[in-house]
Curated annotation (Swiss-Prot):
Compartments, as annotated in UniProt: Cell membrane
Keywords of the record: Cell membrane, Membrane, Transmembrane, Transmembrane helix
Protein name: Uncharacterized membrane protein RP786
Disulphide bridges, residue numbers: none
Species per Swiss-Prot/TrEMBL record: Rickettsia prowazekii (strain Madrid E)
GO CC terms in record: plasma membrane
Similarity annotation: Belongs to the TerC family.
Predominant location: membrane
Membrane topology value: Multi-pass membrane protein
Length: 297
């Protein structure tokens, strides 16, 4: 029943998004983007209350912790999506269509990765320690890297697409596939979608690795991930412009990843409660936000 409720909510949100809010392909305003993201955030928080009533306080804490971690880790993802759109000169009126179908892909791929990951961890528990090393290494690396970049032209996926598919840079509305002279061509909207899906998969490995350390409950992991991504994609049209202003968020994320990594290593000796994980996550993110704001004053 819980899965039916979740998928019903997601289906309703997607229908609302594509069928009503973006039906006329108008560029959403900055204010509209903020309000829409706030709406998604409220829905996500209300779902957390549903988790609390049906699964208990600890599961609710795990849900909110996973939700916040996924939100934070997806910020770089949003920045790279912006780079992809700029590289292909995708008009703002068509960007939402790419993001929408990207969400559909995320819903499918995240399910596969999460279910597969849980099965592997249940069978090979030592894999958690490998994930812990990856998380700590990623956290340390995040402290040392000034900015993430994405070289589209030299990426393997881009080169493979250009080599194996007929690509046209002339758009015909929102079409991903265009037929000309009895020949099929793929538009840059399609290429953008494939690159974005690839980036989503790469980022999913880090984020899900972090979340596996919080809980191994498939329902909590999957629902928190999907709600977090839905909210961020709706905020894309303003977030892509302001994400760089919050320069200290990456340090918050680094602290969270290192904390989670060490949590895995010591869990046989010290069991860290869900409320501590949630407190560390919220405190770290607040530190990053406040420090970023103070730097601009």
């Amino acid at each position: 029943m819980s899965w039916i409720i979740f998928y019903t909510i997601i289906a309703a949100l997607l229908i609302l998004d594509l069928g009503i809010i973006h039906k006329k392909n108008k560029v959403i305003s900055f204010k509209g983007s903020i309000l829409l993201s706030l709406f998604y955030f409220i829905i996500s928080c209300l779902f957390g209350i549903y988790v609390y009533h049906n699964m208990g306080l600890d599961h609710a804490r795990e849900y909110y912790t996973c939700f916040l971690i996924e939100k934070a880790m997806a910020l770089d993802n949003i920045f790279i999506i912006s780079i992809i759109f700029q590289f292909f000169n995708i008009p703002s009126t068509y960007q939402h269509r790419v993001l929408f179908f990207g969400i559909i892909g995320v819903i499918i791929f995240k399910a596969i990765i999460i279910y597969g990951g849980i099965m592997l961890i249940h069978k090979f528990s030592w894999l958690l320690y490998i994930l812990a090393v990856i998380l700590i290494a990623t956290g340390i690396k995040t402290f040392n890297v000034s900015h993430k970049t994405y070289d589209i032209q030299n990426s393997y996926i881009y080169k493979s697409i250009i080599k194996n598919l007929n690509i046209t840079h002339d758009l015909e509305g929102q079409k991903f596939v265009i037929k000309r002279n009895n020949k099929l061509y793929f538009s840059t909207l399609f290429v953008s979608l494939i690159l974005i899906e690839t980036i989503d998969l790469v980022f999913a490995i880090d984020s899900i690795a972090a979340i596996f350390a919080i809980t191994n409950d498939v329902y909590i992991i999957y629902t928190s991930n999907i709600f977090a991504i839905l909210g961020l994609r709706s905020l894309f049209f303003c977030l892509s412009e302001i994400v760089e202003r919050f320069s200290y968020i990456k340090y918050s994320l680094a602290l969270i990843l290192i904390f989670i990594g060490f949590k895995i290593f010591i869990h046989h000796y010290i069991e860290i409660p869900a409320y501590i994980s949630l407190t560390v996550t919220i405190s770290s993110l607040l530190f990053g936000i406040i420090a970023s704001i103070l730097e601009k004053i």
